[in-house]
């Protein structure tokens, strides 16, 4: 919290995530962290990994991403000044493009924009493994920390780990997020994030 965000996926290993966090705490830029991860992958196989990293850099955000050539297709990432969006096993580039458009065009605070971006992937089979389930994804989560949050007790930590067949995880996460906002009388115009 207060420094940036790191997301590792595609053959996720906790050690790579922890190494990335340690590099960020040591002051490395997002690009330096990715270069380090590629050179020091815990399994010596960075081509199956995917990373997205942003940092605040004292008010001048930076972003970087990496998509290994052996991640499952369709795979890609896109970067903006204050975001990194990545995906693999996708229907196609249109999923990433939709997420980016929704992030950029959703008003509100960061959590609203992140939720909007995820809704941009709310298409049956966006993750092609889920086509037969009639859903976009296997699970969905939203984690947002305030700058001074304890890493083990962050401001928003919602997780839909799985749903019965045909129940959309992103819709369930949207309900959880809306309930969280209502239950906490959350107004990002006055409370930030």
Which positions does each model-derived feature cover?
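N-terminal nucleophile
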Residues: 1-193
């Amino acid at each position: 919290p207060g420094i940036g965000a790191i997301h590792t996926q595609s053959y996720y290993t906790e050690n790579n995530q922890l190494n990335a966090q340690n590099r960020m705490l040591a002051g490395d830029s997002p690009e330096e962290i990715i270069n380090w991860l590629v050179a020091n992958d815990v399994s010596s196989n960075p081509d199956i990994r995917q990373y997205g990293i942003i940092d605040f850099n004292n008010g001048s955000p930076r972003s970087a991403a990496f998509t290994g050539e052996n991640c499952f297709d369709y795979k890609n990432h896109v970067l903006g000044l204050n975001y990194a969006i990545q995906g693999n096993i996708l229907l196609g580039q249109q999923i990433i493009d939709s997420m980016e458009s929704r992030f950029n065009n959703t008003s509100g605070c960061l959590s609203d924009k992140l939720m909007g971006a995820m809704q941009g992937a709310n298409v049956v089979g966006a993750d092609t493994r889920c086509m037969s389930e009639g859903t976009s994804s296997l699970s969905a989560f939203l984690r947002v920390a305030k700058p001074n949050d304890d890493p083990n007790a962050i401001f928003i930590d919602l997780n839909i780990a799985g749903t019965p067949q045909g129940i959309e995880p992103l819709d369930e996460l949207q309900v959880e997020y809306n309930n969280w906002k209502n239950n906490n009388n959350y107004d990002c115009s006055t409370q930030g994030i």
